[in-house]
């Protein structure tokens, strides 16, 4: 056979070539002898090919000799052959007389015959198919007549080979080996035929295939045998024979009745080498699950094909499932958003120098403002700040702007002892400033060290400036409307923060000049006034959150440790004071908590202001949003307030305001007390009249307001309290107030001379006269600052003169429209020509904003108008923010001392700016003249105004 295997007869070679598609031919190792089977016919080939297709072909080998129920098993031809157990290792199959028997329906293994070494009958080679499975051993079998078996389990892994294992030949009756155990056993025709013959003669019932299968299923033959050394490559035997034997099941195939001769030939032909099994892909090898069912028979060549469709189906199903999860193109469509709202976001493109996302209104303002593109590129942030400020000021009602002026305008007295109480620290209004009245009204918490929570502008720095006075409300007929419509910057006063101890307050307010010792001694508020202020401030704070324009944190006058001075009104306001203080404290705490959580708007913080410690037992007072100094309440009141942090419902504000007004207003009807009402102005919620007091015939100014039409009732209370506490020769005095038939009547001192605006418009003033006006104004500011009040609207329109030349500050909200002379500038709502740069740019500010305004007013007295008055309001704001100190047209004509005075008053940096106390000591004050010298100017201005009105009347 010379290295080639002749398995098939010439007549059958053609038919088997297409059945067995994976025939392999191997070179015979030199030492290997061949076993062949010679007799074979076409019929046996067909049977063999079909049996190979059976997945259970491996089970027929063992069943063959035992299944006597099959007719094919009964017909066997046995040729006894004597094979000694110690036969030579090399013996040709042809030398042995091998019986041929048809043992099974088909013992097919369509594999080429591969040469193998002949080994003793009691030693066998483990087939690759079963090499990976544990093997069992059986006791030795009688040498010549033993049936050759190997206890091995099929395994799909055919890549490994093992050396021959000692396998004892056992009786099928004694050791019922499983079907899988016969896989890969070397084919020994002699032993098989001998066993079949013995079975036939004995006529003993053999176990059925069912029993055998059960045995194989119940008794696991997979015992791990010690791994033998690797065998020679040539000594590998295919399990084809055993598979072919197992594949035949007599009861299921009619072809099991073929002749013995044919079956015998088939059996011998299939005792091929094991090498073919190695070459089979794992997918073509029958598995145990496959061997359990013979109904689904597949050919060796189309085994894979039968699986592929199922696998593809599974894969496609799984892929479809994954696609549905990950990103299938069949996604549900999402509808477009409904009722979308586009929020404009203004940005700046540094490449093009253009703003993006500007609202149309802002674009129009910029185009009409006269601000060049170059300027916009150089200061983009300032432009945004100015636009925001301008929009806020122009959109607020004038009345609101007027009334919010003193909101939260108090600063803490840094010199006062720290509060010892545990209640939340509330700065008290009227507290003297450590820096003196000139120091800004910034409340200590507002100072850089104590960021204000919820303060307007707090996003920029801890104590953002309170909004500029909101809109120039119906200010006095004068230009009060020029007051920036934006709520006056909230006093630096921060919402009361229980966590900030008075001691922790900054030693100085930002931008506050150091006052000369004792210069600005804190002025204690009278208890009744403070209490009233507390009520009013509380009310004001509730409503001024968003639009209150604080006049700056009013410095809180320190409540002296000594008992407060009793006041006649103390009894009247004591009960209200306690109630108001508690309510304010609750609001302050709630606001502080909300601010810490980012819930409060910056405007809300404007209203809140810590009160300075009033005494050793200082009761934390809520910041008077209105800026009116508050009376420190008993310690008991403070803890109570802290216990109830929540604000009262906003709905109750109107009721609270009315109740508060009743407590602070006098009883009676003003129409019975005053006579001769003459209307001189009109505000948003009422008119301004002059009248004479019955009996004394004193001329007074009366403002009548309808509370139902007043949007900021709490601000009204604040203004009343501020004026009550601000009795000073240089401040328009508050006389009385009445609440009658739902209308509030406020009676104030009337200044017949009109405003300084008329004087500077129709007259040229000397430096001495200018110095006198500045001195009187500084004195009034010093007093306000000592009370913790920032006026924030110092300008010629709010400086009133008497016919004798006396000068007083006005516009505490109620005097806004008293002077009809201001009607000229009423249309210029919110144009802050006198405002400090820090206010325009929405930065933190303090009491020194009033000093800047005083310097601008000095220029106004020199030139007859403030700088940039001829510019558009928006451009004026832009120039104030970018130019800083304005340019004086004829500066060289001024004396050096006057220029020096202006230099310190108009410092852009509030820290370097002089305070009211500093300027009162400036050498320029030496040039002051007697106030009586102003009387002629006042009369001349009145005459000129009358003539102008007469011309207009014609």
Swiss-Prot record:
Which spans does this entry mark as compositional bias, Low complexity?
1-17, 127-136, 143-153, 203-214, 245-256, 265-277
Q: Which PROSITE patterns match?
A: CRIB, PROTEIN_KINASE_ATP, PROTEIN_KINASE_DOM, PROTEIN_KINASE_ST
Q: Where is the Protein kinase domain?
A: 674-925
**Ranges of Polar residues composition bias in the record:** 33-42, 57-75, 100-121
Annotated spans, Disordered: 1-165, 203-316, 440-562, 587-655
Its EC top class is transferase
A Gene Ontology biological process term: vacuole inheritance
Cellular component per GO, a single term:
mating projection tip
Q: EC number(s) on record?
A: 2.7.11.1
Question: The CRIB domain covers which part of the protein?
Answer: 334-347
Matches recorded under InterPro entries: CRIB_dom, CRIB_dom_sf, Kinase-like_dom_sf, PAK3-like, PAK_BD, Prot_kinase_dom, Protein_kinase_ATP_BS, Ser/Thr_kinase_AS
**Function of the molecule:** MAP4K component of the MAPK pathway required for the mating pheromone response and the regulation of cell polarity and cell cycle. Phosphorylates histone H2B to form H2BS10ph.
Q: Give the protein name, as stated in the record.
A: Serine/threonine-protein kinase ste20
The organism encoding this protein is Neurospora crassa (strain ATCC 24698 / 74-OR23-1A / CBS 708.71 / DSM 1257 / FGSC 987)
**Gene designation:** stk-4
